[in-house]
Amino acid sequence: MDKYIYVTGILNPNEARDEVFSVVNKGYIGPGGRSFSNRGSKYTVVWENSAARISGFTSTSQSTIDAFAYFLLKGGLTTTLSNPINCENWVRSSKDLSAFFRTLIKGKIYASRSVDSNLPKKDRDDIMEASRRLSPSDAAFCRAVSVQVGKYVDVTQNLESTIVPLRVMEIKKRRGSAHVSLPKVVSAYVDFYTNLQELLSDEVTRARTDTVSAYATDSMAFLVKMLPLTAREQWLKDVLGYLLVRRRPANFSYDVRVAWVYDVIATLKLVIRLFFNKDTPGGIKDLKPCVPIESFDPFHELSSYFSRLSYEMTTGKGGKICPEIAEKLVRRLMEENYKLRLTPVMALIIILVYYSIYGTNATRIKRRPDFLNVRIKGRVEKVSLRGVEDRAFRISEKRGINAQRVLCRYYSDLTCLARRHYGIRRNNWKTLSYVDGTLAYDTADCITSKVRNTINTADHASIIHYIKTNENQVTGTTLPHQL
């Protein structure tokens, strides 16, 4: 069956084609395209090379693409009661669905049937004519009574006695002697979950949960860590999303967001204890690292961000001072290279890669270079690290530590992953020239078990032995910031 006839409900092929292309054209779609989403399915219609293209929908037939684009552009995705996948399959299908069309208003798969659609046309016309002269409430009453009786009823006249057809259905259930009634806790949980799904069936509420998805994901990770759960507990995800939307604060500062997420988690703890008799450990201090930092948060809150990062992928020692050191060095790098608009994560990775290449020795015969060439958004930029070196020296002098080494040992896992991702294989060890270059940095001995199963264990063992037994200390001239 012709796709254009199918999607428009117009039986004349030429008229159906004209109707489709009155909507599916460059002018209507616009230069930026149009996006649509429903129940997790997302599509974007764009005009490309004199034809419509749909992100999220592919077909070898251009007429099928045009038909589905017409369906989207006419608002079909937002008005249909069917699952978007079913709509895709209907448009793709080549079989004749004429009989199916006759059950829909105007034969369109996105059209909604009116409550009086089963009445004869004359009765429907009478109801429509009566609605024009009746008040809204009387018009609604007229339609409801007419539908129930099965014919048009004039509610302004004396109603004659009639029999209203009612159908009583008896539901037969098979019950075993041991399952006559469910435990109260199970019944309560079923009612709770049913009510939740009814609340989430609202498209606006469901769409709003996307705006808090980052918080829902991190909160779920917190619960999985605290309890013997898996990330597939969909009901927990649904509750998280709904409560985060309902309780979202107007003030979105970091401290308020922490209190907001903790309020939701506290409610979930109560639900878990009520239905499953499980106590969830962890308080606001444990939760705080799982609350994402936003780009608009002030600098002084960056230490919380790095506490979160260290919470997930670091070794244990230095846990108290490393987030503070990271915050100070990252802030210095971002301030010194403000024109590059570095994010905190980018800045931290640049610092770790820099010291993995040039070492973390407190004193050196050869100065570390002041700049590192970094590809940012497709362009190679010179990133200045002179300020980072100076700040690290001051921290080291004040605390009596090697701040660079403490930091890099603490984030050694992240360094390893960054070197592997960016293909950095620089190896300054002549005696270990054979090892994997991505592991050839002087804090590789601090790689934890979280990453160890992804690296060459033999090379890693050689590096650990070399670092622990190496007596060739690097000494000599003072650092550039000591001049």
Swiss-Prot record:
Keywords: Host membrane, Membrane, Transmembrane, Transmembrane helix. It is found in: Host membrane. GO terms for cellular component: host cell membrane; membrane. It is a single-pass membrane protein. The chain crosses the membrane at residues 342-359. This is Protein P55. It comes from Grapevine leafroll-associated virus 3 (isolate United States/NY1).
